[in-house]
Curated annotation (Swiss-Prot):
Main EC class the enzyme belongs to: hydrolase
Organism: Baumannia cicadellinicola subsp. Homalodisca coagulata
Record keywords: Antibiotic resistance, Cell membrane, Cell shape, Cell wall biogenesis/degradation, Hydrolase, Membrane, Peptidoglycan synthesis, Transmembrane, Transmembrane helix
Subcellular location: Cell membrane
Domain of life: Bacteria
Record GO cellular component, one term: plasma membrane
PANTHER family, A to Z: UNDECAPRENYL-DIPHOSPHATASE
Catalysed reaction equations from the record: di-trans,octa-cis-undecaprenyl diphosphate + H2O = di-trans,octa-cis-undecaprenyl phosphate + phosphate + H(+)
Enzyme Commission number(s) from the entry: 3.6.1.27
Name of this chain's protein: Undecaprenyl-diphosphatase
InterPro entries per record: UppP
One Pfam family matching this protein: BacA
Main function: Catalyzes the dephosphorylation of undecaprenyl diphosphate (UPP). Confers resistance to bacitracin.
Amino acid sequence: MVDIYGLVVALILGIVEGLTEFLPVSSTGHMILVSYMLGFNNDKTKIFEVLIQLGSILAVIIICKQRWFLLFGLNLKKWEIYQHNINHGSRLHLYHIILGLIPSSILGLMFYEQIKSFFEPKYVMYSLILGSLLLLISQLIHDKKPRATCIDDISYLQAFLIGCFQCFALLPGFSRSGATISGGMLVGVSSDAAFEFSFLLAVPMIFGATILDLYRHLPVLSLDDIPMFIIGFITAFLVALITIKLFWRIIKGMSFIPFVLYRFLLVIVFYLILI
């Protein structure tokens, strides 16, 4: 029998995921808090929140496919929304992505169980505050004349350091995009370049986390869960695709201050709800 309420929850969480995945506000944090409000907080919740992120990642792969083809030494017709930033003699390649993945991959595997224990609303609120402080610091003290003005200028060391900042995002509520963009700005990368590099890092990072969660939680899942996962996945994909296409250039040039204020407001709202 189809669980109508479960499908509605999946639809809502898919919308939340698609809207927030690439903003520095933490999509995982939003989904945990919204899941709690909707009463969807059983053993399957944690893996569902990771699985539907694949929908957003598919949207990124489609929109950024030219860059991915170049990373693998291939070429494709030029039509991406940020195509003007792509140099077909690109100096960015897979080594940059691998270096950016190493720190968080190691810590994620070593402390998997401990990290999952933080998937609770109260910890999300703490992480939202900490992530806001990093966003604020990077906004105030970043280099006004960055050494890497476009994504192809990012060095191996900068890629690795951005990956180190990504480790903060292992805490739900911190924001993976917020951590990587802020980290990039603090190590001499322009906000535009850090934003694009954050997009590329998201694909293997979230895909790897999903595979690991599936492996760990497979016994908890059943065939009855498939419709809910499909609804969440498709919704997240479509909403993320629309959001990225509409707001790519706007988000890249924005100050972090509105996001910092939003995150603090979100903490206050959910604190009042949870007490």
